[in-house]
């Protein structure tokens, strides 16, 4: 993409309404625009990042055996009355009527609808286990939306729902999603720590929030430093191997980790002082087993191997891709702007033509652009006629992993300068060497 043809509305000043780093940088870098309280448009560069996050989520959900569907945003109130949640949910749910005066709602979540889909088609235990997921926009009428897309009223969610014959099957479904989430967050460039969460009236120990450590986090969290050294499960993880999954979950739940709500001072005291980490955290995912909470009132049953009907045991697993984008910025930025992990960066590299109109600079820039494009690097070529300082500021702000600087002096010497955004390291390379280095990373 050429910057001269790209819609990138950069803000030079810090927006007054932005309270946290991610909100400020997303507005300044032209990723989002606020349309009303807690509701945002995603602009081209922001949408590219959001789509890359969703791609990684899809790949890992599919790897774990989940099936993607797409449920509507508008739901019937009748389904929610059937589960008993319509009147109990509260003012966060946006309730509407169609022209026939039928009561509808803008879905804040999808347990009822996915249970209705399941009960309409699945009759036998032989069709289990089953995990259905979708990525869809949701709306919750927050009293005080704040922090940009971190706590907005409209947001994108990946919701997965598992259906199993019994608790043991549901536990393994939970373990599959647990491991899938570890891999997902690592691929997005985040070090997420699973922390035991409240299971409410259902009880048990199958509820975890995935937390990343960040100074601007809303929650106080406590964990053993051992988590920071645990190896994330690799791409060769066998999601059909129950023993392997159980071993991974055991390793990732044995050290102490808890949010403020679940913090136990007695257990915390057992952690060596030098291993204690007390910090702020941001929730980026939540997985939860809720048994027959929805299958019972909605009659979601299957015939078991004993010939009798059994209520299915269910779980839900949520990641907010839009929130995840903001979390990645909170975890990786500096005073100059965003520092994107390579996996979700909007472009693979930025080419800075220091002197558009100069035959040598234009020629080298075009050569780099063509080579990187053909190699799948997806470069952004800054071909705009602006002063060098503005070009560098824009590249640092939008956070592309690598910058290739093409200037008259370097071109005369047959070289370009390559800058690593994260480390700030610069090196002068021959044009062919620069192309080889960047295409090797594609």
UniProtKB/Swiss-Prot annotation:
Homodimer. Its EC number is 6.1.1.15. The keyword Zinc-finger does not apply. Keywords: Aminoacyl-tRNA synthetase, ATP-binding, Cytoplasm, Ligase, Nucleotide-binding, Protein biosynthesis. This is Proline--tRNA ligase. It catalyses: tRNA(Pro) + L-proline + ATP = L-prolyl-tRNA(Pro) + AMP + diphosphate. It is found in: Cytoplasm. The keyword Aminoacyl-tRNA synthetase applies. It comes from Brucella abortus (strain 2308). GO terms for biological process: prolyl-tRNA aminoacylation.
């Amino acid at each position: 993409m050429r910057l001269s043809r790209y819609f990138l509305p950069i803000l030079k000043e810090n927006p007054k309404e932005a309270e946290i780093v991610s909100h400020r940088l997303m507005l300044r870098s032209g990723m989002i625009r606020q349309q009303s309280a807690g509701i945002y448009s995603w602009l081209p560069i922001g949408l590219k990042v959001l789509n890359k996050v969703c791609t990684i989520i899809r790949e890992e959900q599919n790897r774990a055996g989940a099936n993607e569907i797409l449920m509507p945003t508008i739901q019937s109130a009748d389904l929610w009355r059937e589960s008993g949640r319509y009147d109990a949910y509260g003012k966060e749910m946006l309730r509407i009527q169609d022209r026939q005066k039928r009561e509808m709602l803008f879905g804040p979540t999808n347990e009822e609808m996915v249970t209705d889909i399941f009960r309409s088609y699945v009759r036998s235990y032989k069709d289990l286990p089953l995990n259905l997921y979708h990525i869809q926009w949701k709306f919750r009428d927050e009293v005080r939306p704040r922090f940009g897309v971190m706590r907005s009223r409209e947001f994108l969610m990946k919701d997965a729902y598992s259906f199993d014959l019994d608790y043991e099957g549901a536990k393994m479904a939970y373990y599959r999603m647990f491991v899938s989430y570890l891999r997902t967050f690592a691929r997005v460039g985040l070090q997420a720590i699973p922390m035991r969460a409240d299971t409410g009236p259902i009880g048990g120990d199958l509820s975890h929030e995935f937390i990343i450590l960040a100074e601007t986090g809303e929650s106080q969290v406590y964990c053993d430093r051992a988590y920071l050294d645990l190896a994330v499960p690799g791409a060769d993880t066998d999601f059909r191997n129950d023993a392997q999954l159980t071993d991974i979950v055991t390793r990732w739940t044995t050290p102490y980790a808890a949010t403020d709500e679940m913090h136990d001072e007695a257990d915390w005291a057992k952690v060596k002082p030098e291993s204690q980490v007390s910090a702020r955290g941001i929730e980026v995912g939540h997985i939860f087993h809720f048994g027959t909470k929805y299958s019972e009132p909605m009659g979601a049953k299957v015939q078991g191997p004993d010939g009798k009907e059994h209520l299915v045991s269910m779980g839900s697993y949520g990641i907010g891709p839009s929130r995840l984008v903001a979390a990645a910025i909170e975890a990786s930025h500096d005073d100059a702007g965003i520092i994107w992990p390579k996996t979700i960066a909007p472009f693979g590299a930025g080419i800075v033509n220091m002197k558009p109109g100069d035959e040598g600079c234009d020629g080298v820039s075009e050569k780099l652009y063509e080579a990187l494009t053909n190699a799948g690097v997806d470069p952004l070529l800054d071909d705009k006629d602006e002063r060098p300082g503005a070009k560098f500021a824009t590249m640092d702000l939008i956070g592309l992993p690598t910058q290739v600087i093409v200037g008259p002096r370097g071109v005369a010497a047959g070289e370009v300068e390559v800058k690593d955004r994260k480390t700030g390291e610069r090196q002068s390379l021959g044009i062919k060497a620069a192309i080889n280095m960047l295409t090797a990373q594609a």
